[in-house]
Amino acid sequence: MEIQFLGTSAGQPSKSRNVSCTALKLLDELNEVWLFDVGEATQHQILKTNIRPRKVTRIFISHTHGDHIFGLPGFLSSRSFQGDGGPLTIYGPAGIEQFVQTSLKVSRTRVSYPIKYVVLKEDGLIFENNLFAVYTARLDHRVPSFGFRVVEKPRPGELLMDKVAEYNVPNGPLLGQLKAGKTITLSDGQKLDGRDFLGKERPGRVVTIIYDTRPTENIGKLADHADVLVHESTFNGDEEKMAHRYFHSTCLDAARIARDRHVRKLYLTHISARYTGKAGKELEHEARKIFKHTRLANDLDSFEITLRG
C-alpha cells in the first residue's frame, strides 16, 4: 500500500504545485489504484508517475469545487483512449454525474467503459469487499463536502512453522491452504484446521483523506487511530479566523486532530499559493510543535504505508 500526491495546491495551481489529487496505490492488495479528487491536469501529473490509468478503478470526489474536479473529463477520456480500461466507479456529492456527463456530451467524447456513480448523501459505509471498506462523513464547507476513511480488514496471523513441522505438512498447495486458515486433510486422513496454525491476527491499515473543511466533529471520527491522515492545510495558524471564515483549516487544526486521534502520520496538503519555499516548510514546522509526525506533502511525493507492529 502506497500513497502518492499528484496535486497539493489550494484553489489554483502554483509553479510548484498542481491542484488536488491523491492516489492510493493498492497494487499488491487489489492490483488497483484509487484517486481522491481529480483536479485540473491530473492526467499530466500521472505521466510523471508509474500509475497506469487502466489501474484506476475507483475515484472518490470530496466536493464539486473546480480545483477538485476539473481534471475528471480529461482523465476519463484518456483512460478510454489508452484502451483496456475496465469499469470505473465514481463516488461524489450530487452533481458530479451531471458534471461528467455534460462535459463528455459537449465535447462529444465517448468512453469505452461503463462508469457507475454513487451519490454521497449520508455518513457511513460506501464500499466494501473482502479486503477493504470505505466510509464517508459530511464535513463543513461552503458546498457539500465529504471526508473518507479507507479501512483494510484485519490480516491473518503468520503461519506457525514450528507447529506445522510437528505434523509434517508438505510444501505446496496444502501449506498454502493452511496459511489461508482453511482445513486440510493429510495423506493419513488427519484433518488440520488452519486457524490453529496461525499467529495473532494483525490489524489492517487505515488511511483518512480530509479535503476542504473547517474543524468539525466528523473529522475526528474519520481520523481515529489512522495510520495516515491526509488533511487540508490551506493556512498557517496565524490565519485561523480567516481560514474558518472561508470554511478551511490551518496546519494547527490538522495537527490537533492527528494528536488527539492517535494518528501515526500526518500529511499536510491543499496548500495556499502564498506559502512557497520557506513559508511552506513553516507550515510543517508549526504543525510539528503539536504533532511531531507531520510532513508537508509536495507534488509527486510517494510514501509506503507499513503495517503496524
Swiss-Prot record:
Nuclease: is it a keyword of this entry? yes
Query: What GO molecular function annotation could you give as one example from this UniProt entry?
Result: 3'-tRNA processing endoribonuclease activity
Give the first-level EC class, as a single word: hydrolase
Which residues are listed for Zn(2+) 1 binding in this entry? 63, 65, 141, 212
Q: What is its EC number?
A: 3.1.26.11
Q: Which reaction does it catalyse?
A: Endonucleolytic cleavage of RNA, removing extra 3' nucleotides from tRNA precursor, generating 3' termini of tRNAs. A 3'-hydroxy group is left at the tRNA terminus and a 5'-phosphoryl group is left at the trailer molecule
For this UniProt record, the keywords arranged alphabetically read as follows: Endonuclease, Hydrolase, Metal-binding, Nuclease, tRNA processing, Zinc
Record's InterPro entries? Answer: Metallo-B-lactamas, RibonucZ/Hydroxyglut_hydro, RNase_Z/BN
What does the entry list as the binding residues for Zn(2+) 2?
Answer: 67-68, 212, 270
How does the cofactor attach, per the note? Binds 2 Zn(2+) ions.
Name the active site residues: 67
Q: Does the keyword Nuclease apply?
A: yes
Cofactor(s) the record lists: Zn(2+)
Q: Which PANTHER family match?
A: ZINC PHOSPHODIESTERASE ELAC PROTEIN 1
Entry function: Zinc phosphodiesterase, which displays some tRNA 3'-processing endonuclease activity. Probably involved in tRNA maturation, by removing a 3'-trailer from precursor tRNA.
Q: Which family does it belong to?
A: Belongs to the RNase Z family.
How does the record describe its quaternary structure? Homodimer.
Q: What is this protein called?
A: Ribonuclease Z
